[in-house]
Amino acid sequence: MAKKKFSKDWIHQHINDPYVKLAQQKGYRARAAFKLIEILEVEKLLKKGDVVVDLGSAPGSWSQVVRERLAGPGGVVDGRIIALDLLPMEPIAGVEFFQGDFRDDEVLHELERRVGNHAVDLVISDMAPNLSGVGVADSARIQHVCDLALEFSCAHLKPNGVLIVKAFHGSGFSQIVQSFKQRFKRVVERKPKASRDKSSETFLVARDLKDPVLNQTTE
């Protein structure tokens, strides 16, 4: 009975969520689009010509936002967007999507092959592992996903590149923040208005690598 009530409450909340309604009006595939929009505006990120990697992209709302901001004359993308997710994603014009598990070495190598020698301006990650409800196990899964995004970013970002990653408050969060601060000069925490009040999610915005692998002139 409690589970059924929870389901009804969630449906009621979802239907009456202003961001759900706004996403439908704007044509975004998910309300999460507004989380990224706010972060990009506050941090003054993303310009035409940028190379962006979207990790955990399905259903595609973040890629939609990036595409809008990189669109030039005629709606053609001025830049590059590479998206990856474990789940399938309906095509978005100008977005290079492929399906796979980012935790799989073969998938990671394929992503790196697609990026090639192009230095990345922005990595965005809305990835979240399946949670079991067991605190220690869930914290380890969350940290692992964040670490993977961090390592990829450190290897492929421009020196002044930026990583936006979803994390969750709780056990292990401080360790995630510390690992980001060891690699980036500036790390801030953002809780967009579109994040639900009861959610423990937060977004880390890390910029300016301390020890960049790629040269600024790499294209």
Swiss-Prot record:
Pfam families: FtsJ. It is found in: Cytoplasm. GO terms for molecular function: rRNA (uridine-2'-O-)-methyltransferase activity. Its EC number is 2.1.1.166. It catalyses: uridine(2552) in 23S rRNA + S-adenosyl-L-methionine = 2'-O-methyluridine(2552) in 23S rRNA + S-adenosyl-L-homocysteine + H(+). S-adenosyl-L-methionine binds at residues 60, 62, 85, 101, 126. The active site is at 166 (proton acceptor). InterPro entries: RNA_methyltr_RlmE (IPR050082), RNA_MeTrfase_FtsJ_dom (IPR002877), rRNA-MeTfrase_E (IPR015507), SAM-dependent_MTases_sf (IPR029063). Keywords: Cytoplasm, Methyltransferase, rRNA processing, S-adenosyl-L-methionine, Transferase. HAMAP family: RNA_methyltr_E (MF_01547). This is Ribosomal RNA large subunit methyltransferase E. The gene is rlmE.
